[in-house]
């Protein structure tokens, strides 16, 4: 890690800073959700219901009339007035990774600058594992439809997913070496080269690389938003594993040790809040089970994959009441002034993601049609 010498006119805001909207890319029969499309659509409608209580909702969908019809059956007229629908084709719905990464102008004296800047990185299906070409084009298509109150920078020469980075809004970016150094992303670039590029793109003071904590079943090669999340007042919420019988035990114990050795840019230790590790969940094709004798694939269930709204936090639950409640309490400690709302995410994890993975926040003012305030 080293300090950037670049002028810091712009910053990548922390997720808890004021927002204009949350973006969703809507599920449809052409996505991998097809086998359980009714169930995942219900989950998206539940998310839309919660989000529109607090802020606007931008929806990218290949079928605006059908999606509007679904939303109108669930939402009130007042909530529907906060929904913005844009017609865009998609391969899948993981907007955290194909959506816009929005920088905000911090030095307000630079009045000649557009105060928001979208960085459009290349999304390639997490190293060309899945179809990605349509998803990679979504941000630019929304820009040309005048969805954003922002300039846009083309960074299609560099692969980067939103779920692979966490910003504290003060110049520190967290990421994982397992993901950013994974094959089929940015080779032959090495650690130092990628570190320098991240500092340049996001005008950072430093990048903190985490080297452990890769969830079994994670298709992303270890996204930071599945294991460690940044919260206000130099707080890190992280997934712990205290069960020596869990095959992930050693890896997450080592992650915990690394976190305890980290210091803020100012030289203080971080406040650490441990989230529980959900009991293992296995996909047996026609159903999910927590039976340890299952021969199904283990899914990457995690409580770290929560979404921060203006006055609330939506966090994933997994029909594990004690652990669901323990996670809620820890998240509440990090966000004492926000309502903590659980959403059953058992359908989402069947495609190896959770709530944060299917959502993307837009900072306050970055949306072209931004008239709603709460």
For the regions a language model picked out, list residue spans one by one.
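The feature marks the mature, well-folded catalytic cores of soluble enzymes
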Residues: 1-374
């Amino acid at each position: 890690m080293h300090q950037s010498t670049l002028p810091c006119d712009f910053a990548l805001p922390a997720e808890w800073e004021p927002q204009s909207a949350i973006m969703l890319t809507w599920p449809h029969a052409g996505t991998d959700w097809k086998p359980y499309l009714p169930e995942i659509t219900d989950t998206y409608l539940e998310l839309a219901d919660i989000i529109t209580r607090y802020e606007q909702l931008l929806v990218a969908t290949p079928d605006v009339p059908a999606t509007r019809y679904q939303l109108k059956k669930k939402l009130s007229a007042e909530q529907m007035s906060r929904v913005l629908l844009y017609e865009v084709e998609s391969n899948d719905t993981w907007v955290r990774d194909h959506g816009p990464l929005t920088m905000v102008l911090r030095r307000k004296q630079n009045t000649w600058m557009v105060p928001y800047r979208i960085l459009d990185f290349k999304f390639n299906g997490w190293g060309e594992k899945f179809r990605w070409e349509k998803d990679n084009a979504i941000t630019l298509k929304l820009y040309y439809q005048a969805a954003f109150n922002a300039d846009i920078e083309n960074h299609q020469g560099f692969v980067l997913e939103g779920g692979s980075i966490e910003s504290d809004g003060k110049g520190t970016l967290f990421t994982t070496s397992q993901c950013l150094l994974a094959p089929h992303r940015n080779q032959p670039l090495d650690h130092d080269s990628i570190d320098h590029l991240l500092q340049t793109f996001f005008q950072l003071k430093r990048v903190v690389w985490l080297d452990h904590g890769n969830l079994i079943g994670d298709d992303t090669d270890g996204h930071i938003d599945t294991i460690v999340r940044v919260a206000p007042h130099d707080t890190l919420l992280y997934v712990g594993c205290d069960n020596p019988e869990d095959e992930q035990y050693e890896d997450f114990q080592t992650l915990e040790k690394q976190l305890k050795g980290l210091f803020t840019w100012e030289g203080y230790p971080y406040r650490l809040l441990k989230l529980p590790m959900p009991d293992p969940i296995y996909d047996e094709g026609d159903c999910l089970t927590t039976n340890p004798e299952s021969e199904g694939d283990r899914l990457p269930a995690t409580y770290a994959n929560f979404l921060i709204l203006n006055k609330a936090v939506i966090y994933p639950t997994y029909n594990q009441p004690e652990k669901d409640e323990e996670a809620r309490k820890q998240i509440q400690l990090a966000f004492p002034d926000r309502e903590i709302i659980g959403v059953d995410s058992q359908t989402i994890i069947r495609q190896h993601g959770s709530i944060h993975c299917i959502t993307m926040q837009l900072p306050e003012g970055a949306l072209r049609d931004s008239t709603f305030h709460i």
